[in-house]
Amino acid sequence: MLEILLLRLSRSIGGAALLALAPAVAAAGVAYFDVARGSHPHDVAAAPAPGGPIYYTAQSSGKLGILDPKTGRYEEVALGSGSAPHGVVVGPDGAPWITDGGQNAIVRVDPATRAVRVFALPADSGYTNLNTPTFDRKGRVWFTGQSGYYGRLDPASGDIKVWKAPRGRGPYGMTTTPSGEVYYASLAGSHVARIDIETGAATVIEPPTKDQGARRVWSDSRGRIWVSYWNTGQVGMYDPAAKSWREWNLPGVQPHAYAVWVDDRDHVWLTDWSANALVKFDPVTEKFESFPSNRSGADVRELQGRAGEAWGAESGNDRLVMVPAR
């Protein structure tokens, strides 16, 4: 294995920390990018353009990280007092949008100026334990709260609505289909739910396996919903058109599937904490391919990416990982 690391350089510009690192390059084109020690990057999102920035939530330090994958340089932007960011997604405006559990708010960071705008949830919503954001076809931000909530922010007006989840606590991962429908997974509730994006009503959809611990969800190009099962170590697929399910067991001993993401070729990517690996699943051949981390305890909690690249945040190792998606 070849690893090339440059000396760490740091300076401060406009209150944002900038650090320069070269990636560690591993076998099969897998690359690792160190970030600030103790930041414990939780979620990750990739700007869609090739070579564009990679955003990550530095949950332990209350910052948004911005990585330039071409140089290995990363920048950190403080999000506000008490911040504990969880999820991040790149919106239709090209900006990173963050679910911030510490501030009980949705946060936008301007990709050019680094200006931070905080959209606080209504006071009567209480502490929601914000988790994952996604955008609907009208450019509105939807979000989950593990305390038993989901909600919607209209960036144009600043209006925020919050609903109680039909089965209480557990809403975790969230996704939008190509047609603009929104789904979430309930970890504690072991189900998936479809949200009517106009009324806000959520309809529960039960997977065949009980108590599976549906953690995260992602849509493929056909609008099928892929679900990572934390408790049972499976990946499930719900086809809304047929109203049918299929499920597959991840390889290995006692797998625990945390994150799920679907690439532009409709390959399904997962993280298996038991195997300390990213796992690719081909729905056509029904074959799995594993990409173990070169360090123990990677604890990848989220996957996102863009054409040709799957990105994950190794929260246990304070670094990001990129696996070629081909």
Language-model features, listed with the residues they occupy:
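An edge-strand/N-cap motif at the start of beta-rich repeat modules
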Residues: A27-Y56, L67, V323
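A short beta-strand motif characteristic of beta-propeller blades
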Residues: V30-V35, R73-A78, A115-P122, D159-K164, ...
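Blade-level signature of beta-propeller repeat domains, shared across WD40, Kelch, NHL, RCC1
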Residues: G297-R326
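Conserved beta-strand positions in repeat-built beta-propeller and related beta-rich domains
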Residues: I54-S60, P96-Q103, V141-S147, Y183-A188, ...
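Short loop/turn segments that connect beta-strands within beta-propeller blades
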Residues: D68-G72, D110-R114, D154-G158, D196-G200, ...
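A short loop-to-beta-strand structural motif that recurs across blades of beta-propeller domains
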Residues: K63-G65, N104-R108, G148-R152, H191-R194, ...
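Bacterial N-terminal signal peptides that target proteins for export
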Residues: L2-A17
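Beta-rich, blade/repeat-based domains predominating
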Residues: R37-G51, S81-D93, D124-K138, T144, ...
